[in-house]
């Protein structure tokens, strides 16, 4: 394909416009940035954006796609030119210009009446031939300030087709799903053995008046057990029900048995203590009292000494007295 420059596309413009960021930064006056087109061949940075046919309002698809002389990858200026597909936004294509990276951009404005932004039907055409040279580490000002939508000529990622059986999996149920549902239900409803019988509500405790309690205690002191007729008569006299009188006597008998058992145990322990005390006192008295003299031992010194012998006694006077008595008998 023959490379068509911006001046061929727009013959009405006599002089192409070219500018560079280094000229803007280094030139003392603002108008000096517009230099000749010979700066296109300067490969200082290697990154260029060809403006010829780039900023064309109503420039048409052919101008946008072929403005770089390369394969117009993203051309959206109209129904389509010989260099790239049709589109409506910006156009960028890699071209064989001097430098490592050469990006040709064609940004078309609103579509004109002459076939999607053509020069014949557009409001006006602005054409500039030049290179915007930007270092690799500097972002493009135009691309950052005015982001353009991606062109229709971009290579689209093919959509993954839906699996034929995915929609059918929603209706499937697995055993672990059933167990999980059952476990969740048991957590909220409780175990079936717990729900078999509802919990019984505790009845409030019945309170009796002091007069009723006094009459019941008197009757219980006289009679621990009541017959049916006696219980009915007592309940009628105290304005109580038969069940209340029966329950009160049952509880009172239980309390009486417990108190009686405790009292009996206390009496038994006290009797044991008294018995031990009496035995100890009797033993002490038996040790303190002297044994009566045997008439046979009085005449026999040996028997007398054996009778009065007390090995557990430490009193030496008794031993001397025994020896003296034995010597006297001899």
From Swiss-Prot:
Disease named in the record: A chromosomal aberration involving TLX1 may be a cause of a form of T-cell acute lymphoblastic leukemia (T-ALL). Translocation t(10;14)(q24;q11) with TCRD.
One GO term describing the cellular component: nucleus
UniProt DNA-binding residue ranges: 201-260
Protein's name in the database: T-cell leukemia homeobox protein 1
One Pfam family linked to the record: Homeodomain
Annotated segments matching region Disordered: 186-207
Subunit structure: Interacts with MEIS1, MEIS2, PBX1, PBX2 and PBX3.
One GO molecular-function entry: DNA-binding transcription factor activity, RNA polymerase II-specific
Record's keyword terms, sorted: Acetylation, Chromosomal rearrangement, Developmental protein, DNA-binding, Homeobox, Nucleus, Proto-oncogene
The organism of origin for this protein: Homo sapiens (Human)
Sites of N6-acetyllysine modification: 236
Single Gene Ontology BP annotation: animal organ development
Its biological purpose: Controls the genesis of the spleen. Binds to the DNA sequence 5'-GGCGGTAAGTGG-3'.
Other remarks on this protein: TLX1 is oriented in a head-to-head manner with TDI. Both genes share the same promoter with robust bidirectional activity.
Gene: TLX1
Lineage of producing organism: Eukaryota, Metazoa, Chordata, Craniata, Vertebrata
InterPro entries: HD, HD_metazoa, Homeobox_CS, Homeodomain-like_sf, TLX1/2/3
Origin superkingdom: Eukaryota
């Amino acid at each position: 394909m023959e490379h068509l420059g911006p001046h061929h596309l727009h013959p009405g413009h006599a002089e192409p416009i070219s500018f560079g960021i280094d000229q803007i930064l280094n030139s003392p006056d603002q108008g000096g940035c517009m230099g000749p087109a010979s700066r296109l061949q300067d490969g200082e940075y290697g990154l260029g954006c060809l403006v010829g046919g780039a900023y064309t309002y109503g420039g048409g698809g052919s101008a946008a796609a072929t403005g770089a002389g390369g394969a117009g990858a993203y051309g959206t200026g109209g129904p389509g030119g010989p260099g790239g597909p049709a589109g409506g936004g910006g156009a960028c294509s890699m071209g064989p210009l001097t430098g490592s990276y050469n990006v040709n951009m064609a940004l078309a404005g609103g579509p004109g009446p002459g076939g999607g932004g053509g020069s014949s039907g557009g409001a006006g055409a602005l054409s500039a031939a030049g290179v915007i040279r930007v270092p690799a580490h500097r972002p493009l000002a135009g691309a950052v300030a005015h982001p353009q939508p991606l062109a229709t000529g971009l290579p689209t990622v093919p959509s993954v087709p839906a699996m034929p059986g995915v929609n059918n999996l929603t209706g499937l149920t697995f055993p672990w799903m059933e167990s999980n549902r059952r476990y969740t239900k048991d957590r909220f409803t409780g175990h079936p053995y717990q729900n078999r019988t509802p919990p019984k509500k505790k009845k409030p405790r019945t309170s009796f008046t002091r007069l009723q309690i006094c009459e019941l205690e008197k009757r219980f002191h006289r009679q621990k057990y009541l017959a049916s007729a006696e219980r009915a008569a007592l309940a009628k006299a105290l304005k109580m029900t038969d069940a209340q009188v029966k329950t009160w006597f049952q509880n009172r008998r239980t309390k009486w048995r417990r108190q009686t058992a405790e009292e009996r145990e206390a009496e038994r322990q006290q009797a044991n203590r008294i018995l031990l005390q009496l035995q100890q006192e009797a033993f002490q008295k038996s040790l303190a009292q002297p044994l009566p003299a045997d008439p046979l031992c009085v005449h026999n010194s040996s028997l007398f000494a054996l009778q009065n012998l007390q090995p557990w006694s430490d009193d030496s006077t008794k031993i001397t007295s025994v020896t003296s008595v034995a010597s006297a008998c001899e």
